[in-house]
Amino acid sequence: MAIHLYKTSTPSTRNGTVDSQVKSNPRNNLIYGQRRCGKGRNARGIITARHRGGGHKRLYRKIDFRRNEKDIYGRIVTIEYDPNRNAYICLIHYGDGEKRYILHPRGAIIGDTIVSGTEVPIKMGNALPLTDMPLGTAIHNIEITLGKGGQLARAAGAVPKLIAKEGKSATLKLPSGEVRLISKNCSATVGQVGNVGVNQKSLGRAGSKRWLGKRPVVRGVVMNPVNHPHGGGEGRAPIGRKKPTTPWGYPALGRRSRKRNKYSDNLILRRRSK
């Protein structure tokens, strides 16, 4: 990925960066419009996820997470920007005439060939079951339920590793540090998700952040007591509590957000590192 750094010509472009190689020209039969409902609100219209709202209109790109074009070779035709995710996407032309989008594997270039199946080479971009992969393989777009399509490791730069296979299960180490079990029959794609340097980009101005649908962040300590538990006081007053809290009064640091008694609790061997 080539990141272009703007020269300091105006305050809005000072130190702003943009990817100078990836463009967006989606195919009409692989996109559709969608309403962006809620924007951080629940069904009652109450804010549950703060600092979201606005943003530019988006067209959703249909991504092939299942990779069910078995044993048919495809060629990477374009590498495109997708406004719905921080990873890039590739347009694939398959030998039978099918055209689909997939997540862009790191290092893949236009003209490379990919394939999915049970006995395919361990090559970047190929999709195959975990049982056919050697230990230590870097993978992404991992299925949790057989045939449902990839659900894990789809963000830019994500790269879990296959560290063990025993019985009917395979052990994966996820980017978060979590170690969990998954059925060996589930499929995954070889390689790392592209656009690794997405966290090194500088938007350069507030307007670019608003285009992404992200609203300003205000500290609770500078609010009024009616708006936040940290608010109020004379001058630069402390929060007035033993521990920081959310706007709704719950502990802000260290509180577990995972639901209790989930079916997958027995599949997680080690919780993610904070």
Swiss-Prot record:
Residue ranges, compositional bias (Polar residues): 7-25
Any Gene Ontology CC annotation: chloroplast
Cell compartment(s), UniProt: Plastid, Chloroplast
Record keyword Nuclease present: no
Annotated keywords: Chloroplast, Plastid, Ribonucleoprotein, Ribosomal protein
Region named Disordered: 1-25, 223-274
UniProt-recorded Gene Ontology molecular function terms: rRNA binding; structural constituent of ribosome; transferase activity
Biological processes, Gene Ontology terms: mitochondrial translation
Primary location class: plastid
HAMAP family, per database record: Ribosomal_uL2_B
UniProt xrefs under PANTHER family: LARGE RIBOSOMAL SUBUNIT PROTEIN UL2M, RIBOSOMAL PROTEIN L2
Subunit structure as annotated in this protein's UniProt entry: Part of the 50S ribosomal subunit.
Family named by the database record: Belongs to the universal ribosomal protein uL2 family.
Name of the protein in question: Large ribosomal subunit protein uL2cy
Taxonomic source organism: Atropa belladonna (Belladonna)
Gene: rpl2-B
